[in-house]
Amino acid sequence: MVKGIEIFQEYFKEYTDQYVLIGGAACSVSFEEQEINFGRTTKDLDIVLIVEARTKEFGEQFWKFIRDGRYRIRAKSNGEPQFYRFDKPEDERFPKMIELFSRTNYMLQEENGLTPIHIDDSVSSLSAILLNDAYYRALLDGREIMMGISVLKPEWIIPFKAKAWLDLKEKQDVDSSDIKKHRNDIIRILADMPLQKCILPEEVRNNMRMFIEQFDVTESELKNLRIRGTKSEDIKQALKDIYLD
C-alpha cells in the first residue's frame, strides 16, 4: 500500500467526485482491493482534478491537508495544465509526495510561497495527455471508488500508460527505466487483475493499436517480473482482446 493513502482517504472521503488518483498509486489501490501485491513501490500520489465538479471547499480541504502534513517543498509550474508538487512532509503519516494536475486554471488558497518548478519529461508527457480531450473523457469514463478513494480502474490505467510509453520513446535522452516502468506496469496489471473490455475514444484506441504493434518484452524480462509461461505475443493478444475487438 502507498504510504499515506489512508490519511488521504480520511481527508477527502467527501470529495471523491472532484479528483481521480492515477498512475502507480492507483495501481497499488486496485491491487490492494484484490489482496494482491502490486510488485513495485510508489511514493507519490498523482491526482487529477475533475474540472467540472471542483468546488471551493475541495480547495480549502486540500490546502488543510498540505498544512497539516507540513510539506516542506511546495512548487507550481507555469502554463497549462497547472501542475503542483508537494514534497517532504514533516508528518510521516502523510504521502511522501503529491503531484496535482488541473486542466484549467485553478487557484489554490495560500499560493504565496509556492516556488516555480521545471517539469521533467514524465510530467510533461502526462500534462500533454491530460490536455487531450479524448484522454480526459477516458479519465472520466474509467474512474471508480475503491477503498473510499476515487481511482482510475486498472483497465483504464493501461491506455494512459501506453500513451506515456509512446511519448517517452519518441524523446531523446530519456532514462530507459522510465520507459520500461510504464510497460512493466501494464504487464503486471494484465497478469494479475481481472479486466473488463473497454470501449475507448477513437484517438485513444488508435494509440493503443500503435502501442500493441510496438510492444515487446523478452522472456528474461518477464521472469524478472515473476511472470512465467507467458510470451510477448500472449500479452499483445490480451491487449487486442480488451481494447481492439
Where on the chain are the PLM-derived regions?
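Compositionally biased terminal segments of proteins
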Residues: M1-D245
